[in-house]
Amino acid sequence: MGDYQELVSSQSQTNTVAGVATFRRRKIEIEVVENASRGPTWEFPGFGSSQRLYIPATDLANIQLSQSRTLLSEWLATAIIGNDFLGSVLYSVSNVAAKSGKLTPVPLLMVSIVVQLYKLMYAEVITAIPMNGGTYNALLNTTSKPIATVAACLGILSYVATATVAAISAVNYLSTQVNIPIVACTIAILLAFGLLALLGIVANSRAALAIFLHHIVVLSILAISCVIYGIQNPTVFRENMQTEFPDVIIAGKMLDGSAFTAVFFGFGAAMLGITGFESSSNYVEEQASGVFRKTLRNAALPTTIFNISLGIGILAVLPLGGDGGIYASKDALLSKAAEVALGSWFSTWVSVDAFIVLSGSVLTSYVGICGLVRRLATDRVLPSFLAKTNQLRGTNHYVIAAFFLLSASLVLILNTDSTIMNGVYTYAFLGLMALFASAAMLLKAKRPEIPRDVIAPWSTLVLGLVMVVVAIFANLLGDPSVLMYFALYFIVVALVMFIMFERVTILRCLLALMKKTAPSQYAKETAVNYFRTRDTPEVEHTGARGGRTIARAITSIRSAPIIFFCKRPDLTIINKVIVYVRRNEQTHTLRIVHVFSDEESDASVLESFRNLAMLFDSMYPKIRIDFVSVQGDFNPATIEWLSKKMDVPRSMMFITQPDMVSAERVSSVGVRVITE
């Protein structure tokens, strides 16, 4: 039998309404009776405890010194997404021209509007929660973990498809100038940039910046030469304006084109011209303070300019029809336009530039996937070994190796036919954009107290989401069969994450099956007075051969702790946190941490916390609830010290609405915001 405990709420008013007394401050005496746990002892998480920690001043000083690391400056960070973002111009203009014909500039202009809308969305969300993960991170802080994992699946698909398609497209551009083996060269590009990714993001960014600046020079010359050629030869543009709209295929049926179909389906194709826009949010932790917003501006502006100018320029240089026209030259459209405008030498230059910048998009995929998977691994959505870094360069070698093997295998399986992966990427990218707009709305509605540098109007969020949904329908109506391939790839990725989410349930089912099919000779033996500790995971006999190995795995998964920072001993908030952890995490160990400054003045608060922890530990026997009091200041250094002391990644540390800390602190601690 436990002791009688006092629980004191934080409010002290007593009201009487209609003769009924309602108490805002109460003392409740509760007799806590600890019943014997049922089932195997290894399933019992153990009794909660109370602990007080003092942070040595030298430890905090060392942490603050070690936190100074090399971060990406404005243009280095811009170049990484800029190659993917601006490189999409190479194929988006031709795709739009095939759908829109003479109205090609209109969908490209509409996409430029989408870019400006999403630039505000990303600026608001990421400055509020500046952690790697992009859409996954935004949804994780506004919804549940399973919903956020859907965005993670789309993100992984997006990067795999981007790397595969970009590598294939790069080799195809180069093959217009020299005869090369397509499959071997594509895999060679994936391998080369995988090795470059192993050198680290700073080294990558320098190479990316050189590629980015060279690409801007080439596109500038091409745009200007197209304008000059159009002025000197105005008949080409006039004749293009007199052509009919291209026919369209809707659900397998060929229909006559119209202005509506040209704009509608062209807009769906043009949305692929802003690919890479979301990548910067997956390595925001590697960027210096204030850089993220500048990367969006620096990448969006030239993409908007070149999309529209080249959309008009090719109509002034090349006829829509004919053997050498726009429709016939869609695989290397800009190279063909360069040949007509300035000659074969410039066509060769454009082809080489296309090869280089599309290869740079592969590098962006490596950087983005490393940031995303590292975050998923620390959040226990993917295996934790993926978050390990090599000592030499500090890069995620397991992620890079796995990404290369996956991308290279797709190149071999598809035999460099990028049609399927283009479709997979289309739905993955547009799905991510739609989910991000939804996350931005939820953040604005549910997390208004979180400080942010930018506040996007509701009209921006709604209009951006509507335009992305329209683009999804345009692609769906154009070729519904692609959705089947996307679903297959999505299911494969989602299955891996489902296994991680339900690995305890799967292991329990496996143990039950082993008891039936392979019982051990100790099936009837049970252990008495066993208490599990994390360091000595010896378990009783389970009644199945190999059962103790399975039981140890379950114990290890459940014993990984989660930390919740709590300012006040609030019954409602703590109960919500426990419910959230049970619904979204595999662990059975929750540590409530309270950081206080003065022991004497906070003595009553600490005692209330201890009582609450004991109460909830009795109420929820399937989860162990510990209370940890820490004397010091609540700041990033304290959080980092606790992370190392308790071996808990910061992404597995939770907090409520952070109204108790400043915007600068919120942006640097990197913890997850939960509860309403």
Language-model-detected regions and their locations in the chain:
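Helix-loop-helix junctions that connect adjacent transmembrane segments
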Residues: 213-276, 282, 302, 313, ...
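Hydrophobic, membrane-embedded alpha-helices of multi-pass small-molecule transporters
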Residues: 71-91, 246-298, 350-363, 566
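Extracellular loop-to-transmembrane helix junctions
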Residues: 66-69, 93-154, 161-189, 299-309
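Cytosolic C-terminal regulatory domains/tails of membrane transporters and channels
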Residues: 1-62, 516-676
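C-terminal membrane-solvent junction of multi-pass transporters and transport-like membrane proteins
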Residues: 207, 385-398, 433-484, 509-533, ...
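TM-loop-TM module centered on a large, flexible mid-protein loop between adjacent transmembrane helices
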Residues: 134, 139, 144, 245-248, ...
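Membrane-interface loop-to-helix entry segments
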Residues: 185-245, 296-299, 364, 422-436, ...
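Membrane-water interface regions at transmembrane-helix termini and the short interhelical loops
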Residues: 98, 123-128, 172, 176, ...
